[in-house]
A protein has these predicted regions:
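Intracellular juxtamembrane helix-capping segments at the cytosolic ends
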Residues: 1, 215-228
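Extracytoplasmic gate region of multi-pass secondary transporters
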Residues: 21, 105-155, 248-252
């Protein structure tokens, strides 16, 4: 019931840990760009130590322990039967079969199209430092000030996405957070390029990141799986991963062609020109053509729930 909210809370708290980066920029690095490696070395060491601490002292969840105990109490014959059924289900899967199935059914087909648009905007998540330094011509001190507000915006919008998902459903979350990402990225570009204030610039790009990945986690990690039958669920979710890589690669190729042509001062507008159409396309497709999946029983999902009645009837007749 509150899985998305709890996940968002944990993620938001973790994001606030990145406040260490601007703090180290202002102290150890002292806003001298040649010392950047010192900034990232310390968080890496701290992260390693904390991970080791968690590995040694974190306890298993009650859900896992209950499931494990239930499995150990199951007779060996029944375990073997379950394993056999699992292998038979996996044998029905495969990426090629999943792709064919996805394009054949309305929900998954439009999810793929929406993801193609959505991931075209992914360059915005990796190029904000370039925009601030090269296009907005912000000083190292201004970038440090912006980075103090970046985790705050990121954590806040990550938290919002979790509460929206549990309260209003997957589709509303994706549309709302995509709109939020679009607004925040526009604000980031204009705040940086027109020298409004580094604090607003940092908060805006943080809001974009939190909104973008809040929508991305929902569309890729949840809706694909909730729109697929059990025997194809794992294979269908791989499609999302492939789309992320393909569209991200395509966006990178486009920028590699454009970067030598346009001046550095225009980089921000170039990334804006790729981010806005991608997010707008994803919003329109999700709103008009994709159905809600919240509350579905994953054991009974067939993938045909969103097809037109005539098509479903034809498939049932073919199956008979």
């Amino acid at each position: 019931k509150s899985r998305a909210r709890n996940y968002a809370i944990v993620k938001a708290v973790a994001i606030l840990g990145t406040l260490l980066v601007p703090l180290l920029r202002a102290t150890l690095m002292q806003n001298v760009s040649e010392r950047w490696h010192v900034v990232y070395l310390v968080p890496a060491i701290v992260g390693f130590v904390m991970s080791l601490f968690a590995l040694l002292f974190a306890k298993e969840t009650n859900a896992f322990l209950t499931k494990r105990i239930e499995y150990l109490k199951t007779p060996i014959e029944e375990r073997e039967q379950r394993s056999k059924e699992g292998r038979e289900q996996n044998a029905q899967g495969g990426i090629l079969i999943a792709v064919k199935f996805a394009f054949k059914h309305r929900q998954l087909r439009f999810l793929i199209i929406a993801c193609c648009c959505f991931y075209l905007a992914s360059l915005g998540t990796a190029t904000y430092s370039t925009v601030m330094a090269k296009s907005a011509l912000m000083t190292e001190e201004e970038i440090t000030l912006a980075l103090f507000l970046y985790p705050v915006g990121n954590a806040l919008f990550t938290l919002i996405s979790g509460f929206v998902s549990d309260k209003f459903g997957r589709k509303v979350t994706i549309v709302a957070m995509s709109c939020s990402a679009l607004t925040c990225y526009l604000l980031f570009i204009f705040s940086g390029m027109f020298k409004w204030t580094p604090y607003l610039t940092g908060f805006a790009i943080g809001g974009f990141m939190g909104s973008y990945w809040g929508a991305g986690d929902t569309i890729g990690g949840i809706m694909f799986s909730e729109s697929s039958p059990t025997n194809l669920r794992s294979s269908v979710t791989v499609i999302n991963t492939l789309l992320n890589g393909v569209m991200g690669g395509l966006a990178t190729v486009i920028t590699m062609i454009l970067l030598p042509i346009i001046p550095e001062s225009m980089f921000g507008y170039m990334y804006l020109g790729m981010t806005v159409p991608g997010l707008v396309g994803a919003i329109v497709i999700m709103w008009l053509f994709v159905g809600e999946t919240r509350g579905l029983d994953l054991k009974t999902v067939t993938g045909t729930e969103w097809d037109k009645p005539k098509k479903v009837k034809e498939e049932q007749q073919d199956g008979e």
